[in-house]
Regions:
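Acidic, low-complexity, intrinsically disordered interaction modules
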Residues: 34-162
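Basic, mixed-charge low-complexity alpha-helical segments
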Residues: 5-24
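Short intrinsically disordered terminal tails
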Residues: 1-3, 164-169
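Short, structured coil/loop segments at alpha-helix boundaries
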Residues: 1-2, 26, 61-62
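Charged, amphipathic alpha-helical stretches
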Residues: 25-35
Length: 169
């Protein structure tokens, strides 16, 4: 269950249970019936947010962050397998906001052009890699791209990362 935790002083309880629940959520997408383009209206995409309490997704532990990231990637890989069986032109990607993972999502794009707008022309944060930094296993052939989107009024750096299917020209 997705939940915003405003009580920052409370210790996060039940971490192993929450991680098992997150893994079950990711595995569920292997058999999930995909929404049709008509279901999303004129948006051109369908997304699923990370279903955890914010204090788990934004926890300072490297291990917990890596687990959340890997669950997003596993979800996207399961969705991509489902989307390949459909005849439509669909693309799947993880859209990650760093360092606030709670805002991250897995997105199923129904429009190649809309996916291209997220995909970008280059990897602006290269040679950095979330996959290397966190020991993540990416599906074969998938790409990783990072962009610095920090605004002057923000307190710290904000990065957007896309980990998803390659976009052939």
């Amino acid at each position: 269950m997705r939940q915003l935790n405003l009580a920052r002083r409370r210790k996060l309880r039940g971490i192993p249970r929450r991680l098992r629940s997150l893994d079950r959520w990711a595995d569920r997408f292997a058999t999930l019936a995909l929404p049709s383009p008509e279901d999303c209206g004129d948006r051109g995409f369908w997304n699923w947010k990370l279903p955890v309490i914010s204090s788990l997704a934004n926890h300072p532990s490297h291990r917990l962050q890596a687990h959340c990231l890997q669950a997003l990637i596993q979800t996207a890989a399961n969705l991509a397998t489902q989307a390949q069986s459909a005849d439509a032109d669909r693309h799947v990607a993880c859209l990650i906001e760093w360092p606030c993972l709670f805002h991250s999502e897995v997105t199923l794009f129904y429009s190649r052009d809309y996916y291209r707008s997220f995909y970008g022309d280059r990897h602006a944060l290269a040679p950095r890699s979330l996959a290397k930094d966190y020991g993540l296993q990416l599906p074969s052939g998938w790409v990783e791209r990072g962009f610095d989107v920090t605004q002057p009024e923000q307190r710290g750096p904000i990065e957007w990362w896309l980990i998803g299917q390659p976009l052939e020209s």
